[in-house]
């Protein structure tokens, strides 16, 4: 049976909105991790057969197939192509899936997967709102579709509404969310202080550590914030941060490992993606995880570490309730509430952390999942070698 191996993975530190990476062109952010990936892996860049990058809101400096632009901006061989994909927040996790599928199919031997996002420069949903307004489209991407309206009516398609729906359905209180958010910051700060992220990150100029975690946060401070929606429970403190960053990883076939003298660090054990209610939007990791475990024959207890994106605290808390996963195995170094969520880069960012943490702890299986626009969720299971 063919295998897809993870050879190397690296990310930038995640910058806060308006922080140390905010003025960096997205192509240069992506180029930075690509250059480092080639150096760390030792592979001949000309042997790479494709570069698959995730990126949302592909307008302005993020337009024009940024995967290709990042590669060229890195000074790497022109004969290597690139393609940019958009599965919303799961874009670069899907990039890993496409890269792995190319390797598993036998049609490719060396593929780079990654992602980049500068949310300081291009705000979230800019492509669906502000960029469309000069063309007369002012009500979002679903307005005007007869088929959509016939199926879903005029229900709001909004991530904050989805987070509140999850909190209500699974009985998750504001206090539950705030305690989870505080723990995310505490875990992230511990990871930074202990140097757990040092191997997986490459500094960009003076930005050497993740900028998001707050040492001065507390339950008391969180309790003073207004909910995002009137009468709701979700506040900014329980939500992922607006962020800037990039990440990249190299996947290889058995033949490439042999011919290029590479050392595989993990194998892709499973990859899948599922969908559900696009209005609730953010709960798809629950059925997607169940699907993945059934397909592999694994139990949740067989998974040593989990990275589930902390888009909002209710997303992870509902997932924990449904799966019965041990919270001490989940987001052990904090998550997007503390560390940030650079949209199109987050999938590979999380997988980079998962790989390095499996190596640090000696774990075998790591599972990654995340909620995505449209009510979707990717699941990837990697096995440390």
Where are these regions (language model features)?
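Condensing-enzyme catalytic core mediating Claisen C-C bond formation in acyl metabolism
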Residues: 1-24, 36, 142, 220-283, ...
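N-terminal extracellular/periplasmic Venus flytrap/periplasmic-binding protein-like
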Residues: 11-12, 23-32, 40, 176-259, ...
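Conserved beta-ketoacyl condensing-enzyme motif
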Residues: 22-111, 116-134, 201-209, 279, ...
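Conserved catalytic cysteine-centered active-site region
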Residues: 24, 55-109, 153-159, 216-241, ...
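Short, well-ordered amphipathic alpha-helical segments that serve as non-catalytic structural scaffolds
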Residues: 27-42, 66-70, 95-98, 159-166, ...
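Active-site-proximal alpha-helical scaffold in enzymes
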Residues: 87-117, 167-196, 248-255, 342-361, ...
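Flexible glycine-/small-residue-enriched beta->alpha junction loops
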Residues: 110-165
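Active-site pocket-lining segment
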Residues: 162-164, 200, 204-207, 269-338
């Amino acid at each position: 049976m063919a295998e897809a191996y993870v050879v190397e993975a690296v990310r930038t530190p995640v910058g806060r909105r308006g922080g140390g990476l905010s003025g960096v062109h997205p192509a240069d952010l992506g180029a930075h991790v690509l250059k480092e990936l080639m150096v760390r892996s030792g592979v001949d860049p000309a042997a790479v057969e494709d570069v698959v990058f995730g990126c949302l809101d592909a307008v302005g400096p993020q337009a024009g197939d940024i995967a290709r632009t990042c590669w060229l901006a890195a000074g790497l061989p022109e004969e290597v192509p690139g393609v940019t994909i958009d599965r919303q927040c799961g874009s670069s996790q899907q990039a890993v899936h496409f890269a792995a599928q190319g390797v598993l199919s036998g049609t490719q031997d060396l593929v780079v997967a990654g992602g980049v996002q500068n949310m300081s420069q291009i705000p979230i949903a800019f492509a669906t709102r502000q960029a469309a307004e000069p063309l007369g489209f002012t009500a979002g991407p679903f307005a005007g579709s007869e088929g959509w309206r016939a199926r879903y009516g005029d229900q709001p398609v909004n991530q904050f509404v989805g987070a509140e729906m999850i909190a209500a359905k699974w009985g998750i209180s504001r206090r539950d969310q705030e305690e989870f958010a505080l723990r995310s910051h505490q875990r992230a700060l511990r990871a930074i202080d202990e140097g757990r992220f040092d191997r997986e990150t490459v500094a960009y100029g003076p930005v050497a550590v993740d900028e998001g975690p707050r040492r001065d946060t507390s339950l008391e401070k969180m309790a003073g914030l207004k909910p995002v929606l009137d009468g709701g429970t979700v506040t900014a403190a329980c939500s992922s941060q607006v962020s800037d960053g990039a990440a990249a990883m190299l996947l290889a076939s058995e033949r490439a490992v042999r011919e290029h003298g590479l050392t595989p660090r993990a194998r892709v054990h499973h990859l899948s993606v599922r969908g559900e209610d696009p209005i609730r939007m953010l709960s798809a990791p629950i059925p997607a995880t169940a699907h993945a475990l059934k397909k592999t024959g694994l139990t949740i207890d067989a998974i040593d570490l989990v990275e589930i994106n902390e888009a909002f605290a209710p997303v992870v808390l509902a997932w924990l309730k449904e799966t019965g996963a041990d919270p001490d195995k989940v987001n052990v170094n904090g998550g997007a509430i503390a560390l940030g969520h650079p949209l199109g880069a987050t999938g590979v960012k999380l997988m980079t952390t998962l790989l390095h943490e499996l190596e640090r702890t000696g774990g075998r299986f790591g599972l990654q999942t995340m909620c995505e626009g449209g009510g979707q969720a990717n699941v990837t299971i990697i096995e440390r070698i």
